[in-house]
Amino acid sequence: MGNTLFFISLSLIWVMLLYHMFLMQGGFRHYMTFERNIPKWRENMKELPKVSVLIPAHNEEVVIRQTLKAMVNLYYPKDRLEIIVVNDNSSDRTGDIVNEFSEKYDFIKMVITKPPNAGKGKSSALNSGFAESNGDVICVYDADNTPEKMAVYYLVLGLMNDEKAGAVVGKFRVINAAKTLLTRFINIETICFQWMAQGGRWKWFKIATIPGTNFAIRRSIIEKLGGWDDKALAEDTELTIRVYNLGYHIRFFPAAITWEQEPETWKVWWRQRTRWARGNQYVVLKFLAQFFKLKRKRIIFDLFYFFFTYFLFFFGVIMSNAIFVVNLFYDLHLSVGFLAMILWILAFFLFMTEVMITLSIEKTEMNKQNFFIVFLMYFTYSQAWIVLVIYSLFVEIKHRLFKQEVKWYKTERYNQHKSG
């Protein structure tokens, strides 16, 4: 029995490791080629479309001023741009700060959510903002984001030059990466996610996931889909599946860059990532239940990726860890004990290799300090994710059983400028 469980757990772990090695190669290839189309795309852009940028905001007085300054500095004709801040049930000075900007710049305006939609979450806030927008292209940014000057232009450039693209997603970087050890972990995690999961899947399968920020989507698509799902905690992943089901693809175009804050304490990280994990579990369960109604095979492939990530892979890791701990105190008579040790060591070195090669894509991230951080990350941050996924699954099941209402979770913000 012990041997069987061991082989199952190890198989699940190695399938995911090898798949991510494959994705890493794709991400690296995409990095080498994605800028080649820019000159040709620029020539093709005879006229820029009207763009509406939606910024959902709930008690964001700490960061909203910096975000709006970045919006003012965007390289995009202001007569073709509208910035809509959705003030969702804020009790701080968010509204006052937005009003300061709207009085000075006529392309900035504020939408205030009203009952019964006020305070219902990001999806509901986006729907309120969308209803007041008139752009042919809709961009979304979180309230803590500082997009680079060319970000929106590049998102539009990628979208308008690809008729099959329903949406284009850019790259986000961690603005407070050097603040704490946790933010250094998150910085490495986000780089790997974007170049492996986003860049790799785009290169090999023409698949990418809409993130919560720094993306552009066609207005016509949002209208066809009836807006964002206000029951989804991971509204971005949920929207992704529905866009693919319409027959479009989602392009990963890392020329469009934004900088965002990440949690600086474990408590804030736990709450935020629990919401993310629950959101993705909701999406997997929602669309697996509609499995035979899905029209596009590409979606099915991506659903299995999320199912494997949030269910089977973590099950394999948990089982592997449990076997290791139990075997310390009780001999399970594993016939492959030595082989197990070799495979565990190889898995660790493969993890280190994948991450360091991916970090080499970002010029400033391939250094000795990050090597030791990745080493430490394997034994701490990665293990914390395992506990979090178990907890989030428990919370999501309880949420479904008791039919609890989706609430906006406010991630803590910090006063700062770009670091590290």
From Swiss-Prot:
Principal localisation: membrane
Broadest EC class assigned to this enzyme: transferase
Record's keyword annotation contains Metal-binding: no
InterPro entries: Glyco_trans_2-like, Nucleotide-diphossugar_trans
Protein localization: Cell membrane
Catalytic activity, EC: 2.4.-.-
Keywords on record: Cell membrane, Glycosyltransferase, Membrane, Transferase, Transmembrane, Transmembrane helix
One Gene Ontology term, aspect cellular component: membrane
GO molecular function, one term: glycosyltransferase activity
Transmembrane regions listed in the UniProt entry: 4-24, 299-319, 332-352, 371-391
Presence of keyword Transmembrane: yes
Mode of membrane association: Multi-pass membrane protein
UniProt xrefs under PANTHER family: POLY-BETA-1,6-N-ACETYL-D-GLUCOSAMINE SYNTHASE
Record-stated family: Belongs to the glycosyltransferase 2 family.
Protein name in UniProt: Probable glycosyltransferase YdaM
Species this chain originates from: Bacillus subtilis (strain 168)
Biological classification of the source: Bacteria, Bacillati, Bacillota, Bacilli, Bacillales
